[in-house]
C-alpha cells in the first residue's frame, strides 16, 4: 500500500483496482496510478486579501460613478446663475451665535457678499506677499491682524462652550417648633412684672377665684403683694383660700427677692405682702409654706388665708387714709394732665398750698361735705340743670369771702369768672318781652322764626346746642327771605329773567337765493371765494391730516384753554367707541349772575345776554361735533354748514390763536356782493385786523363789525357762528367747524351781525362787552410791566396817556413808582391831555398827584402803603364814573376793589390783635419793583449821557476856539460847571469828554 508523507506523518493510499500504467521516459519502473477522491483533498480556503481587493474595486467603481454624477451635477448647477448667486452669498455670510448658544448664518445682500469676498481676497494676497517677503523693511499704514501678546503658561480647560455648572441643591432642614408650656410663659410674664411693677390679674374659674397681685419694693426687697378684700373696705372672715391659689403663690414667690426681715418691722401699708419659707418668721407664725400679711390681732401677725371669727378685733395693715387719697388723686391728676408741654415744671408751691387750690376748685364745681359720702353725691345727682346752677351760684355767694382771699392765686380768677358766666341767666327781659308782645298772635312764618330766635336769646348760657342750631337755621331762613325781597340791588331781576333760545332758525336770504346755489344746493362763493384767500393766507394756518390732529386739540388763550373736537374727525368703526366720541369734557358750570345779562335804560338787551332754559337756569353748551371744510353759522335751531371756498378743495384751515374772531368776518363775507368782495377783504386785512390785533374785547369786535356794515350794509343780516361765553376767564369763544370738546359754557343769544353791533354801545350796561380772550390777572401784569417800562420813555408814556390812561392807576402797587411818575411830570401831562376830553379822567390824575405829594413827605414804607390803601376807595368811586371802553378798565377796577377789601380785612385783623403778613410781602414787592425801575433808569441814563456827552463836547469845542488851549484850569472849570448843570453831578476829572485831552 502506498503512503504519502506529510512532514513526519505517513498517510496510506489504497491501490485502485483499475490501474493506469504511465510510462516515464527515464524510469524503467511501472507506476501504479491511483484515484484521488475529494475527501482526500484539502478544503479550499479563499484569501482575505482577495476579498478586500474585490470590495475595494467595487467601492472605487461606485465612488467614481458618484463623482461623475456630482461632477455632472456641478456642471449643471454652475450654469444656474441664481443658485450660484445664493451659494456665493452663503459662502461669504458670517456665522453668529445667539444668547442661548445656537449658531446661525446671517444672510447678507449680494453687494455686501462681494465686498466681503473682495476683502478676503485682499487679505489672502497680503498674507501671500508677506510670506513670500514682498514687503520691505519700512513702515506701512494698516492694522495688526493678530495679537501681539505672547501667551505663556496658562491654564487650559477642557470645558466645552455648553458647560454649565450644576448648582448644589440646598438642603431644606425643617425646624420643628418647640412646644412651650404655660409655666414657661407665666415665668416670663412674671419676670417682666417684677421688673416693671405693673399689676397682674390671675383669672380663675368660679366666684372669688380671681387674684390680683403686684410686685412692690419694701425694706430694700422685691416682694409680691396680693390685693385683699379689706383694702376696698369689705371685711370677711377669710380673705382668700390658700388651696385654690397655691400654685399661683409659688410662681409669685419664685420671682420675688427676699432677705433678712424681722416680723416686728411690718406695719401699716404692708397688707397683702407674700412671704415664703425663705423668710425666717414664716415658720413661726404659720404651718403653711406661704404667709400673706393681713394685720395683727393681739400683737400677733394674722395671715389672710386663716379663718377668724371676730374680724373687728384685727388691726388691718392697709394704707393710711391720706396715702390712699393721694394715690387716687395722683393717678387721675397725671392722666388728665395737659398734652402740651411748653416748659419744664418746677416746684414753686408747697403741698399745703396745692391742697388748698385743689379743695377750692373741687368745692366750687362739686360742693359736698364729704367726698366719701354717697348721700352727698346723690344729692347733686338728683338736682335738675337749673337747680344745679342755682345751687352753684348760692354756694359761690356763701364762699365769696374765701374767694376774695384766693383771688391772688394765678389762674383762679378765670375759673371763678367761667363758673359765674356758665351759671348766670339772661336778666335783660324787657327787650325779650317786647319782642314777645309784638309777635304774639301772629302765625306767619317770619314771626314764628323771630319767636324761636328770641327764645334762644332768653335762655342765655343755658341754651343747648339744639336751641342754638334751631335759632341759627331760623335766622338763615329769614336772611334768605330778606335777600330775595331786597329792592336796593338788581339781583331780584334775575329771578324772573328768561332768555330762551328761539326754536325757529333765522332766515338768511343769501343762502336761499337760487342764483347763488349750485345744483346740489350748496352756496357758490364765486369771486368771494377767490378774495377770501386774504383771510386764509394771513390769519389762518393749514391743518395737515397726515401730521395728526393732536396738536390742534388744545386752544390756548392768555387765561386758560379750550379743547377742540378736531380729534373726532378720526371716526372709529366700533359702535361703543363711537358713542364715547359723543361725550364732552365739562368745565366748572357757572350759575346765572349779573355778568350774564346786559341792560340799556334799565331794560334787558336780550341778544347781548346768555341763553337760559325755561326755568331760568342758564343753557349750557353741548358737544359740538367737527366737520372738515365748512363754515358753521346759526345760533338758534340746527346749525347751517356752508362749504368753504373751493379754491383749495383738499385743504383745511384753522384760525391762528388770537384771531378766532375772523370767523365772524368770514360769515359776513357770505352776504357781501361779489363785485365788492375785494374791497371787503382788503379792508378787513389792512384796517380792521391791525386795530383789533389778538384777543380783542367784544366791544372792539362789535365796533369793527359796525364799521364794516357802514360800507357793506347787506352784511347786517349775516348769520353769526355760535359764540360761547366763559365767565370764569371772561372769554368769548367763536366756534369754527372743528367744534368744541369742552362743554358747560354759557351761550350768547346774538345770532346776526345786527344784533352783535349792540355790544358797541357805550350806554350798554354789562360785563360781557368787556370780555376778551384773556384773563384779568394776566392783563393786569401786562399793564404793570408796560407802565414800569414807560416811566423813563416819554414817547411810550404819551401813547399810554392817550390810549389807556387808567394804566397809571396801577402805579399804586409801589410808592416808588408813584414818586418817579411824579418827578417825570406824567400826571401833569395827563391833565393837559384829558382836560378837554373827559373831566372824570382828569380827577384820577389830580388825585394821584395829591397822593404822591403826601407819600413823598413820609419815608416809612408801611405808612406809605397805608396811605395808598386809604385812597383806593376814592379812586374806585371816580373810575366807576369814567368811560368803560378803555382796554385796562376792568383790570384797574378789580385791582382797586382788591385794595379796598384788603384794607378793611387788615383793619379788622389789627383790631383783634393779629399780625398782617402783607407787611413783609410789601417789603419784598417794593424791592422787586425798585430793581425793575433801576434797570429802566440805567438804560435811560445811558442814552441821556450819550447825548449829554455829545453836547458837552460841542460846547468845549467852541470854548476851545475862543480861549487858549494851554489854559487847562479854565477848561476844567468850564467842563465841571457844564456837568453840574446837565448831568447833576460833579466829576473830579473830565473823563466824559474825549475831544480834548486835559492831562
From Swiss-Prot:
Active site: 230 (for p1 proteinase activity), 239 (for p1 proteinase activity), 271 (for p1 proteinase activity), 660 (for helper component proteinase activity), 733 (for helper component proteinase activity)
Lineage: superkingdom: Viruses
Motif (Involved in interaction with stylet and aphid transmission): 370-373
Enzyme Commission number: 3.4.21.-, 3.4.22.45
GO biological process: proteolysis; symbiont-mediated suppression of host innate immune response; transport of virus in host, cell to cell; viral translational frameshifting
Posttranslational mods: Potyviral RNA is expressed as two polyproteins which undergo post-translational proteolytic processing. Genome polyprotein is processed by NIa-pro, P1 and HC-pro proteinases resulting in the production of at least ten individual proteins. P3N-PIPO is cleaved by P1 and HC-pro proteinases resulting in the production of three individual proteins. The P1 proteinase and the HC-pro cleave only their respective C-termini autocatalytically.
GO cellular component: host cell plasmodesma
Record InterPro entries: HC-pro, HC_PRO_CPD_dom, HC_PRO_CPD_sf, Pept_S30_P1_potyvir, Potyvirid-P3
Sequence motif Involved in virions binding and aphid transmission, location on chain: 626-628
Descriptive protein name: P3N-PIPO polyprotein
UniProt organism field: Bean common mosaic necrosis virus (strain NL-3)
Amino acid at each position: 500500500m502506498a503512503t504519502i508523507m506529510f512532514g513526519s506523518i505517513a498517510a496510506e493510499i489504497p491501490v485502485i483496482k483499475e490501474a493506469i500504467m504511465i510510462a516515464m521516459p527515464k524510469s524503467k519502473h511501472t507506476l501504479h496510478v491511483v484515484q484521488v477522491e475529494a475527501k482526500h483533498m484539502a478544503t479550499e480556503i479563499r484569501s482575505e486579501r482577495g476579498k478586500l481587493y474585490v470590495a475595494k474595486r467595487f467601492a472605487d467603481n461606485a465612488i467614481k460613478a458618484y463623482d461623475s454624477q456630482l461632477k455632472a451635477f456641478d456642471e449643471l448647477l454652475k450654469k444656474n446663475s441664481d443658485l450660484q448667486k445664493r451659494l456665493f452669498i452663503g459662502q461669504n455670510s458670517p456665522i453668529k451665535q445667539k444668547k442661548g448658544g445656537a449658531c446661525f448664518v446671517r444672510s447678507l445682500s449680494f453687494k455686501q457678499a462681494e465686498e466681503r469676498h473682495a476683502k478676503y481676497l485682499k487679505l489672502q494676497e497680503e498674507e501671500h506677499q508677506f510670506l513670500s517677503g514682498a514687503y520691505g523693511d519700512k513702515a506701512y499704514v494698516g492694522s495688526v491682524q493678530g495679537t501681539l501678546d505672547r501667551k505663556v503658561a496658562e491654564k487650559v480647560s477642557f470645558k466645552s462652550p455648553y458647560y454649565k455648572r450644576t448648582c448644589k441643591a440646598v438642603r431644606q432642614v425643617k425646624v420643628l417648633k418647640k412646644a412651650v408650656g404655660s409655666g414657661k410663659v407665666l415665668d416670663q410674664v412674671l419676670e417682666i412684672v417684677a421688673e416693671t411693677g405693673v399689676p397682674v390679674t390671675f383669672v380663675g374659674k368660679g366666684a372669688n377665684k380671681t387674684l390680683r397681685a403686684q410686685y412692690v419694693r419694701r425694706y430694700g426687697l422685691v416682694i409680691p403683694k396680693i390685693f385683699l378684700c379689706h383694702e376696698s373696705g369689705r371685711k370677711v372672715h377669710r380673705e382668700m383660700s390658700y388651696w385654690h391659689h397655691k400654685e399661683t403663690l409659688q410662681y409669685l414667690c419664685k420671682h420675688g427677692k427676699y432677705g433678712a426681715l424681722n416680723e416686728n418691722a411690718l406695719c401699716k401699708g404692708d397688707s397683702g405682702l407674700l412671704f415664703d419659707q425663705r423668710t425666717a418668721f414664716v415658720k413661726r407664725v404659720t404651718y403653711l409654706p406661704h404667709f400673706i400679711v393681713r394685720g395683727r390681732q393681739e400683737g400677733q401677725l394674722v395671715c389672710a388665708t386663716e379663718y377668724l371669727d371676730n374680724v373687728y378685733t384685727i388691726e388691718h395693715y392697709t394704707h393710711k387714709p391720706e396715702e390712699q387719697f393721694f394715690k387716687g388723686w395722683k393717678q387721675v391728676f397725671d392722666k388728665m394732665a395737659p398734652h402740651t408741654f411748653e416748659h419744664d415744671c418746677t416746684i414753686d408751691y408747697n403741698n399745703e398750698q396745692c391742697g388748698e387750690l385743689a379743695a377750692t376748685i373741687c368745692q366750687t364745681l362739686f360742693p359736698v361735705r364729704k367726698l366719701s359720702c354717697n348721700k352727698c353725691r346723690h344729692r347733686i345727682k338728683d338736682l335738675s340743670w337749673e337747680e344745679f346752677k342755682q345751687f352753684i351760684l348760692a354756694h359761690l355767694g356763701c364762699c365769696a369771702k374765701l374767694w376774695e382771699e384766693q383771688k391772688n392765686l394765678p389762674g383762679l380768677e378765670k375759673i371763678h369768672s367761667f363758673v359765674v358766666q356758665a351759671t348766670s341767666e339772661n336778666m335783660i327781659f324787657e327787650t325779650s318781652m317786647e319782642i314777645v308782645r309784638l309777635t304774639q298772635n301772629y302765625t306767619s312764618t317770619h314771626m314764628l322764626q323771630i319767636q324761636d330766635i328770641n327764645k334762644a336769646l332768653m335762655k342765655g348760657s343755658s341754651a343747648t346746642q339744639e336751641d342754638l342750631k334751631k335759632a341759627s337755621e331760623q335766622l338763615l331762613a329769614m336772611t334768605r327771605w330778606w335777600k330775595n325781597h331786597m329792592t336796593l340791588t338788581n339781583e331780584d331781576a334775575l329771578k324772573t329773567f328768561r332768555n330762551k333760545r328761539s326754536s325757529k332758525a333765522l332766515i338768511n336770504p343769501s343762502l336761499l337765493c337760487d342764483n347763488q346755489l349750485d345744483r346740489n344746493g350748496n352756496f357758490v362763493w364765486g369771486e368771494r371765494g377767490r378774495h377770501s384767500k386774504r383771510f386764509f393766507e394771513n390769519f389762518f394756518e393749514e391743518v395737515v391730516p397726515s401730521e395728526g390732529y393732536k396738536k390742534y386739540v388744545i386752544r390756548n388763550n392768555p387765561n386758560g384753554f379750550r379743547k377742540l373736537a378736531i380729534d373726532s374727525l378720526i371716526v372709529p368703526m366700533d359702535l361703543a367707541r363711537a358713542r364715547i366720541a359723543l361725550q364732552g369734557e365739562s368745565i366748572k358750570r357757572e350759575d346765572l349772575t349779573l355778568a350774564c345779562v346786559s341792560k340799556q335804560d334799565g331794560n334787558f338787551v336780550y341778544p347781548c345776554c346768555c341763553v337760559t332754559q325755561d326755568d331760568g337756569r342758564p343753557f349750557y353748551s353741548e358737544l359740538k361735533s367737527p366737520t372738515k371744510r365748512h363754515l358753521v353759522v346759526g345760533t338758534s335751531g340746527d346749525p347751517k354748514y356752508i362749504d368753504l371756498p373751493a379754491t383749495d378743495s383738499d385743504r383745511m384751515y384753522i384760525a391762528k390763536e388770537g384771531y378766532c374772531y375772523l370767523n365772524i368776518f368770514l360769515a359776513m363775507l357770505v352776504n357781501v356782493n361779489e363785485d365788492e368782495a375785494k374791497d371787503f377783504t382788503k379792508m378787513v386785512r389792512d384796517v380792521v385786523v391791525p386795530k383789533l390785533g389778538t384777543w380783542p374785547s367784544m366791544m372792539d369786535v362789535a365796533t369793527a363789525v359796525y364799521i364794516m356794515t357802514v360800507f357793506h350794509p347787506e352784511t347786517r343780516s349775516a348769520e353769526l357762528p355760535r359764540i360761547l361765553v366763559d365767565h370764569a376767564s371772561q372769554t368769548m369763544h367763536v366756534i369754527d367747524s372743528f367744534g368744541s370738546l369742552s362743554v358747560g359754557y354759557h351761550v350768547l343769544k346774538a345770532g346776526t351781525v345786527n344784533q352783535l353791533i349792540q355790544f358797541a354801545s357805550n350806554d350798554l350796561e354789562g360785563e360781557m362787552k368787556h370780555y376778551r380772550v384773556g384773563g384779568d390777572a394776566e392783563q393786569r401784569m401786562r399793564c404793570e410791566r408796560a407802565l414800569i417800562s414807560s416811566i423813563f420813555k416819554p414817547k411810550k408814556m404819551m401813547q399810554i396817556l392817550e390810549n389807556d390812561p387808567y394804566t397809571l392807576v396801577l402805579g399804586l402797587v409801589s410808592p416808588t413808582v408813584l414818586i418817579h411818575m411824579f418827578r417825570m411830570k406824567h400826571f401833569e401831562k395827563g391833565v393837559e391831555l384829558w382836560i378837554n376830553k373827559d373831566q372824570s379822567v382828569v380827577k384820577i390824575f389830580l388825585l394821584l398827584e395829591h397822593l404822591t405829594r403826601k407819600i413823598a413827605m413820609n419815608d416809612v414804607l408801611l405808612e406809605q402803603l397805608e396811605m395808598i390803601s386809604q385812597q383806593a376807595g376814592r379812586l374806585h368811586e371816580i373810575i366807576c364814573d369814567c368811560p368803560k371802553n378803555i382796554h385796562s378798565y376792568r383790570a384797574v377796577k378789580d385791582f382797586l376793589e382788591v385794595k379796598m377789601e384788603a384794607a378793611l380785612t387788615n383793619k379788622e385783623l389789627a383790631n383783634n390783635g393779629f399780625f398782617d403778613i402783607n407787611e413783609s410781602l410789601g417789603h419784598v414787592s417794593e424791592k422787586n419793583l425798585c430793581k425793575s425801575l433801576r434797570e429802566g433808569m440805567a438804560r435811560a441814563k445811558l442814552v441821556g449821557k450819550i447825548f449829554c456827552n455829545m453836547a458837552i463836547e460841542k460846547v468845549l469845542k467852541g470854548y476851545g476856539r475862543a480861549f487858549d488851549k494851554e489854559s487847562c484850569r479854565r477848561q476844567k472849570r468850564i467842563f465841571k460847571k457844564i456837568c453840574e448843570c446837565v448831568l447833576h453831578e460833579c466829576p473830579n476829572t473830565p473823563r466824559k469828554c474825549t475831544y480834548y485831552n486835559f492831562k
